[in-house]
Every structure is written in structure tokens, then in C-alpha cells.
């Protein structure tokens, strides 16, 4: 092989582009988020680091909600057998049981098919009454 052949082979090898998500170690698409941010910002000047940061935040929130939802599914599968799917009901219960997520998502958010949060008012709950004995009443009156 001559020198020109070896250099031409080196030139023909192109380095495959590595996605920004892979570089950042994320699953959410950093490039797509960056493009969407550029479309929304009036000056169209957005740092790539802000896109990476936003993608990381969204990925964390999604994983947190998914983890809580899976725990709700496991709780219900103990009560009702053969529960194997995540439903909107599980999602709603997971969000409402976590105080921080509830505060974050509470404002004008409705999950379709989620139902309502189970709540029994204190007045409607049965109150256990202690049995009163006539002897106890007499001792109270005598004092």
C-alpha cells in the first residue's frame, strides 16, 4: 500500500455523531428539548447546558412518578389479584399520596380516568363508644 491509499482510507472513515443525550448520560432527548426551547425563546439564543439541565429535570420527575405509580400497582395487586397494568387511577393515587408532587401538579391538573381520592369525613366514621357501667356513674356522682 502506498501512502496515498492509507490516507484515503483514513479520510473515508467518518466518526458517527454522538447524540447530546448520550453525552450527558440521559434518556430524554436533549436535542429535541433544545430545539423546542429555541422556538419558544424570542431571541432564539439558548445554551445547550440549559437544555441538558431541563432534560435531566424532566427525566428525574418522570422516573419519580413512575416509581411511585409502580408502588401503587404493587399495593393494589396485593388486594386485587392479577393487576398488571398501570392505569390512570394508579397514577392519580401515586401523585396525590406524595406531598411534594401533589403541590407541584395540583394547580389545574386533571388526570382523565383517575377518579377521585378516597376520603371519609370524620363525622361519618364510626366512633367506638365505651361501655358505661352503673358503678362508674355512682362513683362519679358521689365525688
Swiss-Prot record:
One of its GO terms (biological process) is heterochromatin formation. Its main location: nucleus. GO terms for cellular component: nucleosome; nucleus. The keyword Mitochondrion does not apply. Gene3D superfamilies: Histone, subunit A. It comes from Dictyostelium discoideum (Social amoeba). Belongs to the histone H2A family. It comes from the Eukaryota. It is found in: Nucleus; Chromosome. InterPro entries: Histone-fold, Histone_H2A, Histone_H2A_C, Histone_H2A_CS. One of its GO terms (molecular function) is DNA binding. Keywords: Chromosome, DNA-binding, Nucleosome core, Nucleus. Pfam families: Histone_H2A_C. The nucleosome is a histone octamer containing two molecules each of H2A, H2B, H3 and H4 assembled in one H3-H4 heterotetramer and two H2A-H2B heterodimers. The octamer wraps approximately 147 bp of DNA. Core component of nucleosome which plays a central role in DNA double strand break (DSB) repair. Nucleosomes wrap and compact DNA into chromatin, limiting DNA accessibility to the cellular machineries which require DNA as a template. Histones thereby play a central role in transcription regulation, DNA repair, DNA replication and chromosomal stability. DNA accessibility is regulated via a complex set of post-translational modifications of histones, also called histone code, and nucleosome remodeling. The gene is H2AZ. This is Histone H2A.z.
Amino acid at each position: 500500500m502506498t501512502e496515498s491509499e492509507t490516507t484515503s482510507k483514513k479520510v473515508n472513515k467518518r466518526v458517527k455523531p454522538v447524540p447530546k443525550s448520550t453525552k450527558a448520560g440521559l434518556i430524554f432527548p436533549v436535542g429535541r428539548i433544545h430545539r423546542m426551547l429555541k422556538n419558544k425563546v424570542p431571541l432564539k439564543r439558548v445554551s445547550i447546558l440549559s437544555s441538558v439541565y431541563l432534560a435531566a429535570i424532566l427525566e428525574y420527575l418522570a422516573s419519580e412518578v413512575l416509581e411511585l405509580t409502580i408502588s401503587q400497582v404493587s399495593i393494589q395487586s396485593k388486594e386485587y389479584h392479577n393487576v398488571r397494568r398501570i392505569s390512570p387511577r394508579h397514577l392519580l393515587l401515586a401523585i396525590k399520596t406524595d406531598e411534594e408532587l401533589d403541590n407541584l401538579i395540583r394547580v389545574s391538573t386533571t388526570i382523565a380516568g383517575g377518579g377521585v381520592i378516597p376520603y371519609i369525613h370524620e363525622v361519618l366514621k364510626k366512633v367506638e363508644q365505651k361501655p358505661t357501667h352503673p358503678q362508674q356513674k355512682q362513683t362519679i356522682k358521689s365525688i
